Amino acid sequence: MSAKLLYNLSDENPNLNKQFGCMNGIFQVFYRQHCPATPVTVSGGAEKSLPPGERRGSVGETNMESDKETERSSTKKKKSAAKEKHRVSFESSSRPSFSSSPRSSSFSSAEVSTTASQFDQPGENLIREQPNGGLMMPYDLKELVKGSINREIRTRGEEASFTQQQQPISARSSMLLLKESSLRSPCRSSNEWNEGRGAAMKFKESHRLSYDEREMRNNGFRVGSKLKETPRLSLDSRSNSFRSPRADAARSSCPEEPATMTHRRSSSSVVAKLMGLEVIADNSDTEQRRENRFCDSPRPMSRVEPTALQRSRSVDSIKRIPASAASKFPMEPAPWKQMKAGDSALTVYGEIQKRLTQLEFKKSGKDLRALKQILEAMEKTQQLIDESRDDGTLSTTTLMQRTHKPVSAATSPARNFKSSSIVVMKSAAPVSTSPLPQNVTLPNVKVGNSRQTRKVTSGKQNAMDLTPRPGLYKGQLDSTKSNSPKTVRSRQALAADAGSMTKSGRSQQHSVSPRTQPKKLGFEKQTRPTTPKSEPGKRQLGRQQTEVASPRRKQMIKPHSTLQQPDDRLSDARSDLRSLRSDSNISLGSNVDIEVTSRHRLERNCDFPEQHTPKQRSPDFGIKQDRPSLKPLKVTVEQPSPVSVLDAVFDEEDSPSPVRKISLSFKEEDALRSEESEWINKPTSFCRSVPFPQSNRGPMKPSSDHFECSPEEGADFKSGNHKYILEILLASGILRDLEYSMISFQLHQTRLPINPGLFFILEQNKASNVTLPDNKHRGRGFRQQQTNPTETIRRKLVFDTVNEILARKFTAEGCIKPRLIANPLKKLEKISKEEQLLQTLCSEIDRLQQNNSNCILEDDEEDIIWEDLQSQSMNLKEFEGETPGIVLDIERMIFRDLVNEVCFC
């Protein structure tokens, strides 16, 4: 029901007013928005909340409304004085609170309509107010009900969204004021009602503008964005306040870095300190960039970190230089590292001199003369180190300031040589290096008078002569020209490294592993002076002087023993003293002269074929080698460390690589394949001895024991294949003891009853029979048949076929124990078995040859499979184990052929 209808009913029935009052009291308990009217000063709040442009209009309208309301209240009191007294008590308590719910709902709809009309349609209020504009009678019940229903329908959807929001104080006060005015004049016209609604809407609109400032700021309007900028500016100013003017000046001088990098750097340093970690500095940053890096951090420079921590951090960052960064720039040893290297070298010299005084020599004259040359060279080296130490420190410091490169990572004199040898890199640009001073004494450099060297006879050798030679390798002469300016080191750095080189490089010079040898060669490329090649006299005299020829190095002549000896690089001075004692017992007239720098080179040179000349010049290193002729070596390709099945060395003989692969399952087949290739290329050279894999006695010559049961001259054979099959069976010994051959077949590695090497022995026998003039087997055309390569290949096929047929037969029949006692009654049965075996082999060979002549290439595979299935003697289950081996053989052959085509074509 509408509010006006309830008002009319309450006027007629006084008891109904009491009931309305009770209901309003209950509404006040459960619905707090129904609060009693309280006098509120609207003008002051409106003036505070409204913007300055709208204050005058709003104040004028409120004054006009208040005047109208007073006039209405006075006229109403004059008309009904008696009823007013009785009604005021009820109206003040019940009517304002009761009528607040529909009017507040209508008022809230007015609020929404006014705010929406500003953006959508200007004529919307006129359309909504036209039904109320035509009301002339205030107490017309029909029109009141229609108007109230229209208002309720129009505001019902909007009422739910605004019930959850708390109404502002200014809007609530304006609503209560309108309620009081409506209670005083319930009989006003519709025009006055519309004017009151417009005034209330203006009040509400003004207060909404004042209240919604926070909501507009949250929604992201321009006013909110402007207000949000101020605290951000204050935060920036606060962060700027931490920076000192000194830091700002330094920051202006250095190039600015991004703000994200500074924030990340400062936060990472704080976290690293809290976790006990250290920050690793960039290798490419200079020292000035490293100091200016702290300009962006909010902390002052004095509180960054103590000097001891900075020093330890710099040392850690130097130690953590990666290998890729070290390969880009040449690394110079630090001045303090050079000082330490010199001091340690002095102690080594003193220790060597002390130990040399305690030694006793059997041949004092020559040994002491050699030791005297050693000590003179060491003293000269020490003097040069002392003289160049000061210059070296100045040059290295100036070089570090120019290039701002990180300091070398060598922390001990023993590691100084390794670091210097690692960083020397090659470059593609050929640049001629500056000539090095001749007086710098380093390994492999001639020190001493040339007259003393010329007095040495060529027939004798100086044992324990460590004076280096003026010779230079070919590869080093070529590689010194191809060094870039980055790899050219200063003279002072070379002289400073000489102290540590003489200590650690003395024992490393002749026993270096293959992995560290290229690094040492890179260091020697710069330490050796460029000597002209046109000095054959000096070089010949230098070749006659030997290195330290200890018994350990004497064994390096044997290539197999070199693979088993470990490197002896850890003993520096002890190895020299041990070599002194051992060399005193070596005869000086020996003709063996070995001059190689490592075992790796000796192994590599052993792969080349031996020449007839006693001396051979190595094509890689340009040095002379005098080696006794041990045995003729086969020309093989050097095999890399990871052994591959594609290498030719894998099949022929053991690899010279330190990693050796021993193949057991394919040893005989590989030996057969290698020998077969040589035999096919040279069909007439059958005089080569063939090794048997089962025997360890070495190669065997063709013996007459294999041919004691040779076929008779007048024997009847249908074809030459039958005769050759009988020769195979007699030479292999299968016919002599068939049962024992079946047992030995089970124990054989290759799973074949006949050794594949027997074929070459048979061919050697045939070749020898051809040369004999009185041979009983020689007839018409026999010589041409034996020397024809086609016949040789045919015999090879027959031999392999017989071997496979025997393997299948023995596998199918199984293993039988040999008879230990010869029974004469069983001899006929034994002979019959042998004859039966021979007939089976001959018939199988004939069948295969007949099928081969009638076969068609298109149906070749199907015919072969069908014939194999029809053969009753074949058992496919027994040959399942050979399938992986066959597949591996085929794959290896295919891959080897492909690699050969790619590499050599």
From Swiss-Prot:
GO terms for molecular function: microtubule binding. Residues 42-136, 232-268, 285-315, 432-585, 606-626, 690-711 are annotated as: Disordered. Residues 432-461, 477-487, 501-516 have a biased composition (Polar residues). It holds the Pfam family DUF4378. GO terms for cellular component: cytoskeleton; cytosol. Its main location: cytoplasm. Disruption phenotype: No visible phenotype under normal growth conditions, but the lng1 and lng2 double mutant shows reduced length of cotyledons, rosette leaves, siliques and flowers. Interacts (via C-terminus) with TON1A and TON1B. This is Protein LONGIFOLIA 2. The lineage of its organism: Eukaryota, Viridiplantae, Streptophyta, Embryophyta, Tracheophyta.
